């Protein structure tokens, strides 16, 4: 049995990988384990080695990985997170907070659990993300209409919701019936939600900290739109204000899924309201 104080010979590149995957810098790691930054630097450049006890602290308290990870001959082949969030520049990706990155890793675990539970195949024969594709260059209105039809979202259905909470429950359930699993995490002010694409088990995460479900409903369909583009996304202030064409399209599609333009215009006419008199933030 190895002593906790025994120095462990590991590949220092695994230490670098474990830190960078969570957007941590050396000073932050040093602070969390109460060591000088120079000690972490020496571990990562191979000049010195951590003890078993120090590795346990890194694994369980900081990097949140199994201890056995550090005994691998090389870093795991884990796709970088920017392959999911392709509409966000790397400069923004590297600024995502450590605690948010931990939540993303937790969500990736959910995906792996789903794959194991369903033997690697989505339980829905024709999930929505395989039925509605090729959004690039297509009509945004048409995409929204297809989603509304597939999910049975219409004026009659929506008028029966007593509030946004009941609407959210319906939207979440109907998405899962159509092959997209939805989870909630306490995301605080990191973002309103995000999505992770997978060819069989894409998932949407919404912020349980939202004060109302109205925001959750928009987030659901913004992130669904990302999945229909075969990519993940993040719903935050950066992406809402982004000039990236896909982000703009996702915002528009989400809005049109929730409120059908033709139905809105017809209802306004019934109340003798001129659409030109309504500001965007009133819609």
Explain the meaning of each model-derived region.
Residues 1-283:
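Short juxta-domain linker segments that transition from a proline/glycine-rich
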